[in-house]
Amino acid sequence: MSYAIRVAVVGASGYAGGEILRLLLGHPAYADDRLTIGTLTAAASSGDTLGEHHPHLTPLAHRVLESTELTVLAGHDVVFLGLPHGHSAALAERLGPETLIIDCGADFRLTDAGAWGRFYESPYAGSWPYGLPELPGGRERLQKARRIAVPGCYPTAILLALLPAMAEGLIEPAVTVFAVSGISGAGRAAKTKLLGSEVIGSARAYNIGGTHRHTAEIIQGLRVVTDRAVTVSFTPVLIPTSRGILAACTARTSSSLSKLRTAYEKAYQVEPFVYLMPEGQLPFTGAVIGSNAAHIAVAVDEAAETFIAISAIDNLVKGTAGAAVQSMNLALGWPEAEGLSVVGVAP
C-alpha cells in the first residue's frame, strides 16, 4: 500500500480554507487514498465544527476546528495556510523544512523588501517560489518545492492578461488596469462596508492611486518578462456578487491584433487552465465560477493606438485555492491539472 499524503488546513473557517477543502474532497488523490485530510484549524472559530462555517462541505462537517498550534500541525506532509497577511511567517518558520507549506497570504510573495515595506506593516520575511506556473520559469521553480507563495487574486488575473504581450515587447510598459471583484475577495471578517445592505445594488472603488497592495506584485510579475521600467495604474472595484474577477488591462501599442493574438496563442496553447477566447468573444465571470480556468480576450483600439486585454477568473479558485492545489500537485510530482476543473457552473 502506498503512503498517503497527510494535509492540514490552517484557517479552515475562512473562504480560502473552505475552498481548498472543497477542491481536496474532489481530488482523485483523496478518492484513491493517496491523500488524507488531517488537522483543520482556526483562530476565533476554534472549537466549532467545520459545518458551522462551511455547511456545503458535508463529508467534513462533523470535524472540529482546532486552535492553530504547532503541536497539532506536526506530522503533516502538506500544510495550507489561509491566514491574514503578516501571520504566516511566524508559523512557517517553526515547521520543518521537509513539510510542504503553501501560503495563501501575502507574506512571501514579494522579492523586494522595499516594496513589502511600502504596502505592509509587518517585517519582511523573504520570498518563496511563486505559485503561478504560467509565469515563465514558474512551473520549474514549483516542482519539488517545499515552500510556495500563492499569488494574489488580482495579480493572477492581470498577469495572465498581460504577460504574453509584455514578454514580446508588443505593448508599452505603462499599463492601466480597471478590475472588478466579488466580495469574497475581501475575506470573511465582519466589516461594515461588506454588509449585505452596503453592497447590494452598489459598486465601490477602493485603494486607488497606487495604494492597493497587489500593485507591487503585478509589477514584480511583469518584470519577469521585460527589462523595461514597468508602471501599473490599478483601480479595483468591489461589485455585489460573491465570486469572480473581471480585469480590463490597457496599454499603448503599435502592434496589430493578428500579431498580438499570435503571441497569446504561442504562450497559452499548452497551458491547461488558460483559454484564449475566439476573436470577437469576450470573457465573463459566470463562465469560470467554480473552475480553475482563466478566460482571456485581446483587442486593439486602432484609433486610440491602445491594446486591451480582458481576463476573467474565479478569485477563490484560480485566484487562491485552485492555484494552491495546482502548486501542490507540481510540488508532489502529481499531474498538474489533477483535481482541478476548467468547466465553470454558469449560468
UniProtKB/Swiss-Prot annotation:
Pathway: Amino-acid biosynthesis; L-arginine biosynthesis; N(2)-acetyl-L-ornithine from L-glutamate: step 3/4. Belongs to the NAGSA dehydrogenase family. Type 1 subfamily. InterPro entries: AGPR_AS (IPR023013), AGPR_type-1 (IPR000706), NAD(P)-bd_dom_sf (IPR036291), NAGSA_dehydrogenase (IPR050085), Semialdehyde_DH_NAD-bd (IPR000534). HAMAP family: ArgC_type1. It comes from Mycobacterium leprae (strain TN). GO terms for cellular component: cytoplasm. CDD domains: AGPR_1_actinobacAGPR_like, AGPR_1_C. It catalyses: N-acetyl-L-glutamate 5-semialdehyde + phosphate + NADP(+) = N-acetyl-L-glutamyl 5-phosphate + NADPH + H(+). This is N-acetyl-gamma-glutamyl-phosphate reductase. It is found in: Cytoplasm. The gene is argC. Its EC number is 1.2.1.38.
